[in-house]
């Protein structure tokens, strides 16, 4: 038995994302008092009382003739078509506005079970005739922010979705905890959402020529070559000095937090905007967090054929110069809008994910260590004593982390550590991932 789907619909700033967060078991949506914060439909597992369901938050709709408005309507329409129940939300403080009436008619034409939710009712609330004129037979007053009225909402939901069909027990979590989480990150307008839509072959995410359309990290569960993958689209990351609006600061914080919990990060770069310091800053942040990374240059179809070879040479030079800590990182050149080379990106993610999880036996590590340190020993110190790295072991994966035992670890230079790391990459075929070394002093400094 599958979980029922409940879709939240309403004009901007009526509290849909607040209710989404209130009912969500898992990830939270960004909440801000600026209308239109949510621009894509978002999914989460929801629960109210004993009833568990799949909850969809939709963009706030208003009368808007431009292309952005049309795309928002398309997102909401898809969410309504998926729904078993629609929760149509209005603002109890402002009362019924013209946009509420238009949207009410829009929802009713789909002839699906629906509940009118009047939000922001912190005090006792009486429905007047304007609410009845919207044409919904079920109404409930709540305060999503304070959690009041949820018992009444539960009763209305159960009335619309018969208990024997909708309430589930002992159902496995459909979102596996061990899936490969791939975050798509980069500067605004690099084509992150277009890339994900092309992969899943669905206009799941809002796209367009406007920079900064994506404002929240959006999760999409997907299967690729029998692998359970969670694709996470993030808001574009600009330099801190150029972020002025509080909403964009929230979006940037959400994107950075998504990187922290990723397995692999796809860094999307616009081929028409030369590699900038911000791209390198994002890549460095990914590496510092210990994530594996795949670099993707999008809009490759817009680069002149006569310029592509020189472009690639310069690009590889910049990456190798500024990101030596992930030497050999995969770089792919794609056109998301034309679906050119997009599957190669997923193949690269799967490959580097396996490397990121690599475990090397202690015997092989120390065989390699002895050979490498003998080939290039550390210099003699004062008094003729030599710093030695005697032994090593792998302490963790994701990323591969190693503990090395030395008679004088504080004398091991950064350049010698880079030598060891780069040699290890080649010896154990570990390109493009962060490798971490920690040094420990042996008990006998003369050994």
UniProtKB/Swiss-Prot annotation:
<dbReference type="GO" id="GO:0005525">
    <property type="term" value="F:GTP binding"/>
</dbReference>
<feature type="domain" description="EngA-type G 2">
    <location>
        <begin position="180"/>
        <end position="357"/>
    </location>
</feature>
<dbReference type="InterPro" id="IPR005225">
    <property type="entry name" value="Small_GTP-bd"/>
</dbReference>
<dbReference type="InterPro" id="IPR032859">
    <property type="entry name" value="KH_dom-like"/>
</dbReference>
<feature type="binding site">
    <location>
        <begin position="57"/>
        <end position="61"/>
    </location>
    <ligand>
        <name>GTP 1</name>
    </ligand>
</feature>
<dbReference type="Pfam" id="PF01926">
    <property type="entry name" value="MMR_HSR1"/>
</dbReference>
<feature type="binding site">
    <location>
        <begin position="233"/>
        <end position="237"/>
    </location>
    <ligand>
        <name>GTP 2</name>
    </ligand>
</feature>
<dbReference type="InterPro" id="IPR015946">
    <property type="entry name" value="KH_dom-like_a/b"/>
</dbReference>
<comment type="function">
    <text>GTPase that plays an essential role in the late steps of ribosome biogenesis.</text>
</comment>
<keyword id="KW-0677">Repeat</keyword>
<dbReference type="InterPro" id="IPR031166">
    <property type="entry name" value="G_ENGA"/>
</dbReference>
<feature type="domain" description="KH-like">
    <location>
        <begin position="358"/>
        <end position="443"/>
    </location>
</feature>
<dbReference type="GO" id="GO:0042254">
    <property type="term" value="P:ribosome biogenesis"/>
</dbReference>
<dbReference type="Pfam" id="PF14714">
    <property type="entry name" value="KH_dom-like"/>
</dbReference>
<feature type="binding site">
    <location>
        <begin position="10"/>
        <end position="17"/>
    </location>
    <ligand>
        <name>GTP 1</name>
    </ligand>
</feature>
<keyword id="KW-0690">Ribosome biogenesis</keyword>
<comment type="similarity">
    <text>Belongs to the TRAFAC class TrmE-Era-EngA-EngB-Septin-like GTPase superfamily. EngA (Der) GTPase family.</text>
</comment>
<dbReference type="InterPro" id="IPR027417">
    <property type="entry name" value="P-loop_NTPase"/>
</dbReference>
<feature type="domain" description="EngA-type G 1">
    <location>
        <begin position="4"/>
        <end position="165"/>
    </location>
</feature>
<protein>
    <recommendedName>
        <fullName>GTPase Der</fullName>
    </recommendedName>
</protein>
<keyword id="KW-0342">GTP-binding</keyword>
<feature type="binding site">
    <location>
        <begin position="186"/>
        <end position="193"/>
    </location>
    <ligand>
        <name>GTP 2</name>
    </ligand>
</feature>
<feature type="binding site">
    <location>
        <begin position="119"/>
        <end position="122"/>
    </location>
    <ligand>
        <name>GTP 1</name>
    </ligand>
</feature>
<dbReference type="InterPro" id="IPR006073">
    <property type="entry name" value="GTP-bd"/>
</dbReference>
<comment type="subunit">
    <text>Associates with the 50S ribosomal subunit.</text>
</comment>
<feature type="binding site">
    <location>
        <begin position="298"/>
        <end position="301"/>
    </location>
    <ligand>
        <name>GTP 2</name>
    </ligand>
</feature>
<dbReference type="InterPro" id="IPR016484">
    <property type="entry name" value="GTPase_Der"/>
</dbReference>
<keyword id="KW-0547">Nucleotide-binding</keyword>
